[in-house]
A protein has these predicted regions:
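Feature for intrinsically disordered/low-complexity regulatory segments and propeptides
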Residues: 1-94, 103
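Intrinsic disorder/low-complexity polar-acidic segments
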Residues: 93-94, 100-196
Length: 196
């Protein structure tokens, strides 16, 4: 493979402002949506809940629960009883004050891997030009995994997230201002904003 990225989008649903993503998927939207409107257009306006797991004999499995998407009863993963899901609406509302102040505009959002990863990306209003005249945009990314072993990740990135690979590149980048919160902790939006 010589370090090349495999072009796999794994997009379940998405919405985007601006240029059509390379895979041609998603609903095109205007760049003036509120975070909640973007969530709805990206069709990630669903919730998750933990549900007990039982054996065929009716015995409850200790210390484990199914993480279920309530809109269609899809089991997203099996997690521990101390795992705290973050609802998509809470993730999108993280952007509300920045969008309302005019500092950012919602840019892309969606669901990957059948709902196991949800992301929201806002474009920061200020960009800059490189010496050759190329404009560099900056984005603010919120990735909300509904998957055991993955942390909530909030960061600034120069990468426009539109698929699994661009999300992976953003999350693997070093040097970006970022905050990770594990699902065994409570997510406190104001603390994350302070830490950024």
């Amino acid at each position: 493979m010589n370090g090349d990225y495999i072009m796999s989008h794994e997009v379940e649903t998405m919405a985007y402002a601006g240029e059509l993503p390379w895979h041609g998927l998603g609903e095109k939207v205007s760049n003036d949506l509120t975070p909640v409107q973007m969530m709805e257009k990206a069709r990630v306006d669903w919730t998750v809940e933990k549900q007990d797991i039982f054996t065929a004999n009716g015995v409850k499995l200790p210390q484990k629960q199914a993480l279920v998407r309530t809109s269609d009863d899809t089991i997203l993963d099996v997690v521990g009883t101390d795992w705290n899901p973050l609802q998509n609406e809470d993730a999108f509302n993280f952007f509300a004050e920045y969008v309302a102040a005019g500092d950012m505009e919602m840019h892309t959002a969606g669901s990957l891997q059948d709902g196991r990863m949800v992301w929201a990306l806002a474009k920061v209003k200020e960009s800059f030009d490189l010496f050759g005249g190329d404009q560099v945009d900056s984005y603010f990314l919120f990735s909300n995994p509904h998957k055991y072993g993955k942390s909530i990740d909030v960061r600034f990135t120069p990468i426009r997230v539109v698929c699994k690979n661009t999300l992976a590149m953003s999350l693997q980048a070093t040097g970006d201002r970022s905050v990770k919160v594990g699902h065994r902790s409570e997510f406190y939006a104001e603390q994350v904003k302070e830490d950024l």
